[in-house]
Every structure is written in C-alpha cells, then in structure tokens.
C-alpha cells in the first residue's frame, strides 16, 4: 500500500488489539518500504542540492565524478540527518511501552498494565533474535513479576474497604495468569538478571544480526549435514522459526496452549493435531497419555464442527482408534479415572501423583460425550454420501467399530459406578445404553447376533457386564428386553420414552404384533408425544408405521389400515419419517428450517421403504372401502362414513378418466384391482395385486401374496352380496363357494358374520344350506334415487330458512312508519308471489320460522 494512503490510516487513533495482531506483519513490511523510500528520497535531495551548488555540467561530463565532487559529497553526507531503521523504531516503541508500564506501577493501575503487557508481548516477537529477547524486556517482566507478588501479598492483609476496585482487580488477575505462563519461556534469562542485574545489563551487548553471506554459507553447508539430520530427526518449528521442544516435561504446557487457542480465528487445527500426535509419542506416564488423547480427540472433532461439513474420514478413523486406546488405557490403569466435575490440574511443571489418602487420579472429561460425538459424526457422514454407491457401503462398515467403542464405554462406566465415592451420575450410563439401543433396535435378530459376537471378541475375557452378560449376547430379543427394562427402571423423560419405542419397534419388526400393540397402548405415548423433542417424535412415527406393517403381515387388514392412517393419510410420509424434505409451495419453509430438516434426516440404511408403505396402505384401504361403497349403494340409510379420504380421492380420479391404460406403478395396480373387485372379478383383482413387484421386498413374500388372495376372495364375496342382494330370494352356499373358490364353511362364516352385524338382511338356512333374503328391506335403484332427491330438497329448505332468519334477525319493525302504516303493501293486505301469503305488520311470526314454506319447490315436495 502506498505511503500516501498510510497517512490516513495513521491518523486514526483507535484500533483494537486484535487488529494490531492481525496486521502486524503487513504494517512491518510497509514501514520497511516507507523507510527505504524516505532514505532514497533523502539521497536524491542531497544529490540534487550538490548539483545545484556546483557548476552545471552538460553532455558526458555530467555523468563523470571527479575528485572535488566526491569530496563535497562526503562532507554533505556527514552533515545529513540520520534516519532510523525499522528495527530502531521498534526498539523505541518497546522502550516507550516499558516506560508506560513502570509509570502505571507507581499508581497501581492494573487495568492499564494488563493492556500494556499484552502490547509489550506483541512487540517483542518482532525483536527476538535467535530466540533471545531484548534485555530491557527481560528486566521489565522480571520487575513486573516481583511487583505482582508484592501486590498480591499486600492484598491478603488489606482491609476490604481498601482493596482494589473491580477494574484493577480484573487487570491484576489477568496479569497474574499471563505472566506466569509468559515468564516460563524466558526463565533462564530472568534467573540471570536476578542473580546480578548490573552484570546482566552491561555484559554481552546485543548481538549484531549475522550478515547474509553467513546465512548463504550455512544453507550451502546444509546438504553436508543431511546424514546427521536423518539420524537425529527433524525438529518441528513454529511460525517464527523457533524449534518446538517435544519432551514429557513440555506436554502440559503445549496442551494448555492448544486448549486456550481452540475456537479462535486463524487457528491452524491441522498443525495442532500434528503437534499432539508428536506429544502422544513422547508421553510416558498414564496421566499424560490420557490428557493427550483427550485433547487430540477433541481437536479432531473440531474439524467437523461446521453445520454443513462432516468430519473427514481419516480423522474419524483416527479418533476412533484414539478413543479405543483411551478406554484400553483406563481399563489397564484403574487408578486413573476420567469423570465429569473433576478439578483441573493447574501445575504444568509436574504431573499429579497419588497421595497416601488418595485412591484415584481424577482427570476431567466425559467419555460418553466423546462416544456420542463420534456416533453423530458417523451419522453426518452417512447423510452426505450417495446411498447408491459403494462408498456408502464401505462407510457403513465403520458402524461395527463404533459399536465396539460403545460396548467398551458401557463396561467402563459399569466399573467406575461400583465405587460410590466417585459419584458417577446415572444419566451417563443411561446415555451410553441409549446409544447402544439406537444401533440395535431397527436391525434383524441375525444381524444383532453377529454384531454382539464381534464386539465381545474385542473385550478382554476377564471383563463382563452386569447389565448385559457376555453369555446372553447371542439372543437379540433378550438383549433388547434387558437394555429397555434397565432404562425403564433407571431413567425418565425422553430416554425412557425412546427405550419403550425402541422395544416396540423391535417387537413389530419380528412379527410380535400383539406384544407391540399392547405396549403401545399401555405406554400412552400417543397422548404426550407432542411434548417431546423432534427426534423422539420421528421415532414414534417410525414405530407406528412398523406396527402397522406388522399387522398387515399377520393378515389384520383393519388394524393395519387404522394404524397407518395418521402417517399415510397426511401425504407427508417423507417428512414425518425423516426420510426426505417435502417440497413446500409458496416458500413456506425458510432456509434455516430446511437446513434443520436435513440435519434430522436418517441415514439411508435406516429408511422404511415408502413405496412399500404406500402399497400396503392402499391395499388395506381397498379391502375395506370397496365393500363399504357397495353397502352404501344398496342401503342409503347407512351413515355415509369414509375410511380413507386419500384412497377415495384416488379412486374418484381414476374413475373420471376416459381411457385407462395398463397399470404402470403401484398406485395404478391398486386402482385397477379396486375396479375389478367392485365388479365382482376377484381373480382379476388378485392378478393386479400380485403383479406389484414391491411385495418381493418383504420377508415371506409368497405367504403374503397367499394371504392377500384369501382376503380378496372374502371381500369379493361381501361386495357381491351387498351389490346383488336385492335381486335374490335365495342363494345357495355351494354356489357362492364355487364362485369365489372358498370352502363352504368359510362362506357360511362370512355370511353369518354379516347377518349378525346387521349388514345383510337375510337368514341362513342350515338344513338346505342357503341364504334367504328378506324383501322390502333393500331398496330398489329408483327408490334410492327418490330418497336422495328428497334429502337434497330438505337440505335446501333448511338452508334457505336459516339464511332468512339471519337476514331478518332483529328487524321485525324495520318497515313500520310513525303513522302505523306498513311499508311495501299498504294496509298490510295480502301479497301474492313466490313467498306465499304474508301477514300484516302487527301479526306475530310463527315459531321456528315455519312461516317460510319454501315456495313452489316446497309445495311440490309436500304434494
């Protein structure tokens, strides 16, 4: 940037410390450029002045330098003003800051001292030469530390009313925290200063920076020392080129610096991870290894802290290995425990040791939080991968290693909970059991058995679980029962509800419908599910759907349709099951809401097939709606109820089509099967239903197809009886058995059930094995149409009467005049017209609005 623009920047007196820190490098380069420009301009001015004073030269002579001119130039240079270099300017700034700190010490202004101390540390970074700080800086920080200790000692004996104010107290604490950590880097120089301050300040003047030729010589000599470097290994350096020492003594100092820099801008997380990997190699004691592994796992999790990006695969696998190493280390060294609420170790120079009365070395941290975060990162990774690629399958194999970590974490918490003195909260154990349930409840029993066996192989043979013993790992049903019952007894709220839903889902998945149904009804979750979080509501919807599918597999069509009605009838299956984001019209969803919806999506391997779900729902609706429509058509007195509005709309749309082609999808197959079933063609309906390929995705698909064929035969029989009952006097059971290819006993059972439920006006003759229909009960087609017309006319009359009452309400005398005459027909006489006779203005209205007779249409109906 040009120096002319810098002038405007320098005029600004207010700048934050962060800006100074961010732009210190750029300002340094600009100052150097400015110094070079000023020095070059100064030289130009001197040369021009010399030329003006001397005789004016022309031609070639003006480019030649004679002895006289050289002498005059030398004398002028001696009298020129000396220009300070950038380094000298920085030294002046450092001295000014030191003077300010000394002045503030005299008045105990610790707020200003804290600010100036930060500024001083930023300035000294630019002046360090070979890792050595200026001696004036060493003197300043040594004296400041002594002054700090004196002030702290005075504050202990000072009365409360004479202590420092809030601002100075905050500044004092800030300096106390920073100077202790800062002075450790210069401890050798500080000790030398305190030993003999005069000798330290006078001896060994500041070293002059080495010339460039020496640097080039060292660079040229570097290849000769390559072999020696290979033997010794490379040393990691920081941004200033200073070597970073990796030793057991420096581990805690490095970890504290890394922890303090977490969350700050411009933090190189990759570099921090590399440093901690090196620290992990040199860590010797169990305490240091635990601390390094904890910090390393947390730093890897920071790589996936964004809302849209998932954790890199290599870092996830590394975090999984390091977390497994941490659990193994805790299992081996039982005197070290990682628990929440433990006090942080403050002394970076030494590690904690067990005292005579101590039983454990407590390290602050939460193992269950690490496991939950590792699980969440795997879920986010699966969400971002295309499920139809081999990459998704490869990523899914990592679930087995994650399950091993969950089991090891559960065993660790069981072990440390045995000691009541540690006060491990029950919630930690509940959370890790819930994570184990989340990886088991939706899997078939065979898969769970393999998962459990492989997980227990990674555990030492001498370790066992009190909650889920090693011997019971082969029975998936018993495992689910044990885990869920433990959470029923030891948890409440969301975790208890999720455990109950997980067990219901598992039972329904394995065709134990009645157990799942009874648990769902006795839990009363349907009454309080709206008060839970979104994730639990999604699990409730998934469980409800699985119970409905289980009822369908058992042949319970009515129960299946009734269970699936809430989910499938809404038209929002994707959203309710967290398997996709529904396209909303008119921009009803904000980008933030859409982002949250995507974060809630379940991985693809947990999805319930929506096409299969729709097929089951429509098939159940067909088996219930077609007989009902036939019954309503022949018996108008029956209340017109609708079982599935969604199915009715689809059926009406299909019937309005002029030309119907061959079925192409699941919906077309069900609609054409419905049309055939309504016409009594049960074989054709069965063919359409069996042609749906989605049935092959269900276990025991042939048994399901046989069940559907039987259901279609029975509902076809019911539809036939509802439709053609008015045309029969008697009908042989054998005829119906032959027509629908059902056993005569089954036909008799269906007819008897219809008669007992008063759905069919008939009697069953057991001797002749015939159905005798009662005449006069069922209406003819003409009678049905006449009754329908009468109902519509009555509804029209009632609507007109209500409309008239609303319009004339409170206006009985609206047309009366002061002289007693009425408006409209004078004298209140008769008025003919479509409204019939009307009384005078003073006549009372009849009660109930019966004075309005409906006009000509009402007279026609009454006649």
From Swiss-Prot:
MF (Gene Ontology): RNA binding; translation initiation factor activity; translation initiation factor binding
Q: Which top-rank group of organisms is this from?
A: Eukaryota
Which residues lie in Acidic residues bias regions? 16-53
* Xref: Pfam families: eIF-3c_N (PF05470), PCI (PF01399)
Comp. bias (Low complexity): 840-850
Write out the annotated subcellular location.
Cytoplasm
Using the UniProt record, give the first listed, main subcellular location: cytoplasm
Task: Please state what the protein is called.
Answer: Eukaryotic translation initiation factor 3 subunit C
Q: Which organism is this protein's natural source?
A: Chaetomium globosum (strain ATCC 6205 / CBS 148.51 / DSM 1962 / NBRC 6347 / NRRL 1970)
Origin organism lineage:
Eukaryota, Fungi, Dikarya, Ascomycota, Pezizomycotina
